[in-house]
Amino acid sequence: MTTTQLNSPQMSDTSLSSAEEKQGSLSAIKLQLEAQLHAQLQAQLQAQLQEWLGPKGVTFSGETFIVPETHDMVKTLFDPTLHKSNFELIILACLFANLVVFAIPLNQVRTLVFIGLYVFWRLSYNFGIGYLLQQQSLHNRLVDWAKEGKLFDEKNKLFWAQFVQHEVKSQRGKDYAINSLPIEFNTWLVFRKFVDLILMSDFITFCCVVYTCAVENASDFTNHWLVWSRVLTGIGLILFNLWVKVNAHNTIKDYAWYWGDFFFRQINNEELIFDGVFEMVPHPMYSVGYVGYYGFALIAKSYTVLAIAIFGHFLQMIFLHYIENPHIDKIYGPSKNEINLIKILKLKDLKSFDNMPPLVGLYNFNWMRSSDLLNLLLVATYAVILPLFSQSTTQYFALTVTTKLIESFGISTLLVLQSYSKYFTKWCLSNDIPVEKSLNNWAVMYNTLINLTYSSLFGLNLMYFLRGSADLLYHDLLYLRIFIGTLLIFTQTWINASIIDLIGYFGWFYGDFFIPKSQSFANHLTKAGVYRYLNNPEQIFGVCGVMGVFIIWPTFENLTCCVLWVLSNFIRINFIEKWHMIRLYGEQEVNQDSGVTKTFKKHLIPEVIQRKISGDEPLRRRPSSPSLADSLDTFIKELTNSKTKLSQQKLVELSQNLSFANSNYKLTIEGLKYNDLKTAKFATLGSPLKVIWQSPLATHSSKDWIGLYRIINTTYSRNRTILSSAGRWTYCPDANGSYVFARNKLFWEEGVYEFRYHLDGKHDVAYISEPFELKHESVSVPLHDDEVEVFALALKEKIFDRLLDIESTTVPIAQVATSQTDNVLATYQLLSSVISTSTKVQISSKIFLKSDQITILDVARKLYDINKVLDELSYDLSIKKDE
């Protein structure tokens, strides 16, 4: 190359242009990095500022504010360093006034007085606090009363207004400006004192009842091992109760402790908290939060205290059911789309049971079902008739044990054979029984054997009770035994009902053993409800009712039955069901730590040992790191909550915790229909679906896209889609627009589906449409030859036109299929599948391969011929034949 060529103007311009491009690229990268760093610093500053100022609250009228720090009940009342308000002084006076009762000389009278006081305060809890909270939840009544009475208006000089304002200022300090915070917060402050009065008085009067009853039974406190075991057990229950209360308060703080979400919402408390003791048991404040009461009863050795504890605990559960739970469902419950999805899945759950709820025990009994009548006769025979007429209790005990052994060995053996070799399914198919029917047949057999075992156990105890010939292993504490035994029986019933509600009849009857995973409705094990706290709740609580029977009637026979039930249940769950679930869902999902295990590790195992244990686990057992979906979810929430005022509609949606409810994105589907019950929407297979999208113009990207997905494959995340759309997607070039999904853009399988709006060519989800079901179009096969052409037109319109552009019913299908599709065999298989399901006449894809000249009219005539043969082979049992 010459010097002239090296120094040519063209080469110089090219080099200069290249350098400028590199410089521009570096500048763009620098600006991008600076923007990212600025955003990160801003987010950190906002987080630190929010932590310093306190949590952010929003009233139900849309006003936002910083929630000030408050103190718990015990610290407020009994910490001498804190200033006491007027209400707090009144509360302390009421508590110390209980000492006046001890001036009564007779201890029995003191006990009656304290019982009366406890009943008064306990009823005040239910009908005082409960009534006020219900009115506040439904009608915002307390806040309205405060507004109507102008209680927080500094211009109001009425006594009650001045008294309430002085009370609030005495709580928050003299410099507290009442109008600086919403009236909802001030009303909550006053309501807290009413709660403090009732709760503290309730507990103090109960302690006084315990003391007076313990004094009455002072002679029972002798130096004996049984006394010490009773006292130590009671102290253990009380200490556990104390830990539950402290842990619960540390987890949910004053906001939830004093029902703050009845008055306003905290931005960072938009979902229920499952941490600490809340991860260990459901509703710990109402369930295990009262075990200390039974500990007091043990220490006092008083049935009076036990009855009072049961009375208080029962009223607390009533409060939970009628006051707390409805508000929880209102604020934190599922969205409308989720409710519709649950309804659809529950209806789908009955598909394997002839679309009727199957018999569980004697629940769902149907007089028109022969298997139900048979179960009723067997239960009556084993539970009542045989015990009344049997002459030998020993023989009936042998019958009970034999029945349980047959049930245990038979059910377990069939489950093992089904798990490893699909024995039961193969038998059903060999006898021309569809796979869907196999689960129903199994359910009838399984439930019948279970009914036989429990009815025989009931009959055995009925026989001993009527004859009074049983030798009890323990005779004392009859009423305590009855209470504990009844509680265990009730617990087993409740646990079983909860399990069925969560996993459906499909899961209750081991549907995973009989129905292929691809046809089931969930690809993941549930971790909701009772399964949030225990991986296998039925392992203990599934047989605790039998333990309760033994406690009530402690005989050798009941002890033997109890051991049999526990061993059978343990073996079936741990050595059959668990291993099948591992093969089906994977070891990582099956062996996840339950809530109880997590709490146990957190509080009882040192952190060093925990790190050692987690370090020894295989990589596949370690939890995955947080995904970017959480960042997107937080981003959308921050956009919504950044305003100082929220619209009424957005506020309602926020209070109901609707997924994507506050998003500026929206998807609307045209072409859906309501089912007969008006409970869910559906479309027929192949019907075009028009999707209309709306997105904010400022943030819209031409790479935004919409995809169609099966819900059972995307339930793992509502904020990010990892599953491929398999071509069922389209770009959204404009901020607002529509697109018609048809043919290969649709799924051709029945199921529940949804559309997802994704951002900027990525898989971050901005909006999810309402769930809808795809169903097969029903096409009736004619009974007469002259209706075949009409039938062919129906096939063309409802099936063929949705896959191929065929001009008429006499055009060869192969001619069109080969020119319009890339995979002819797949098209033929899809056509045969849809036709078979829609007409309920099974045909094979080979029908299209036998001749290249076959037309839609030929297919219609073939279906007519098959149906005619099947109709001739069948007959109507309701029509009597001529003899």
From Swiss-Prot:
Q: In which pathway does it act?
A: Phospholipid metabolism; phosphatidylcholine biosynthesis
Q: What is its EC number?
A: 2.1.1.17
Localization per record: Endoplasmic reticulum membrane
Q: Does the keyword Acetylation apply?
A: no
Identify the Pfam families for this entry.
Answer: PEMT
Q: What is its main location?
A: endoplasmic reticulum
Q: What UniProt keywords are attached to this protein's entry?
A: Endoplasmic reticulum, Lipid biosynthesis, Lipid metabolism, Membrane, Methyltransferase, Phospholipid biosynthesis, Phospholipid metabolism, S-adenosyl-L-methionine, Transferase, Transmembrane, Transmembrane helix
Q: Which InterPro entries match?
A: Phopholipid_MeTrfase, Phosphatid-EA_MeTrfase_fun
**Which GO-annotated molecular functions does the record name?**
phosphatidylethanolamine N-methyltransferase activity
In terms of Gene3D superfamilies, this protein maps to: 1.20.120.1630
List residues traversing the bilayer: 86-106, 112-132, 194-214, 224-244, 280-300, 303-323, 373-393, 397-417, 442-462, 470-490, 540-560
Residue spans, topological domain Cytoplasmic = 107-111, 215-223, 301-302, 394-396, 463-469, 561-883
A single Gene Ontology biological process assigned to it is: phosphatidylcholine biosynthetic process
Its cellular-component GO annotations read: endoplasmic reticulum membrane
Superkingdom of origin: Eukaryota
Note whether Acyltransferase occurs among the keywords: no
Reactions the enzyme catalyzes: a 1,2-diacyl-sn-glycero-3-phosphoethanolamine + S-adenosyl-L-methionine = a 1,2-diacyl-sn-glycero-3-phospho-N-methylethanolamine + S-adenosyl-L-homocysteine + H(+)
How the protein sits in the membrane? Multi-pass membrane protein
Q: Which family does it belong to?
A: Belongs to the class VI-like SAM-binding methyltransferase superfamily. CHO2 family.
The protein, known as: Phosphatidylethanolamine N-methyltransferase
High-level lineage: Eukaryota, Fungi, Dikarya, Ascomycota, Saccharomycotina
